[in-house]
Amino acid sequence: LLVKEDAPVYAACIGLYLFLEKRQYLWGGAVFLFSCLYFTSAVWFLDHFGDGAMINRFDSYISDESYGLLSMFKTILVDPAYVLAQILTPDKILFLLQMLLPLGFLPLMSLRLGKWVLLIPFVLINLMSNYKYQHSIFFQYTYGSGALLFYLAMVNFRDLKLPIFRQLRSLFLGSGLFCAVALVLTV
């Protein structure tokens, strides 16, 4: 993972989670800052001593090539409808269902911002990329975001407090088990 320029994205989001949700300001801030520093160092290293970071997977978001990835963040802030149109394609919707349906959509069942930051890698790395293998469950690109989704599912399942959610717990478990078995049997 030391040569993967996307690994710090996962770590930075975990740092934000620690900072915002767990109130571990020192550790969360340190993990976030170190991850950002490592990311910029890895991209610089790849640009100067390798073939460069694979930002071409995000070409549809880069409006000004001279700014590189910074231009991508401008596109996200200025034109969120365009970003949604790029994310909500049929193959990415199928991928979204393949990732979230076995988890009963539990990773999405929270109103706490600190938990939602763990969804950033899933959206950024998997759904926003135009590289078809990054939004396919049959390739390694889902390892990091899948682990974060699984963690969120467990934490949100534990935190379900409303009576209706308590009654639906067995339904969540059953649907997750059914989807997991169906997925394994089709592979």
Show the residue positions of the predicted features:
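Extracytoplasmic catalytic-loop and juxtamembrane helix elements of membrane-embedded
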Residues: 35-36, 42-82, 122-136, 142
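Perimembrane helix-loop-helix junctions
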Residues: 10-36
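Transmembrane helix irregularities
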Residues: 1-6, 20, 40-45, 107-111, ...
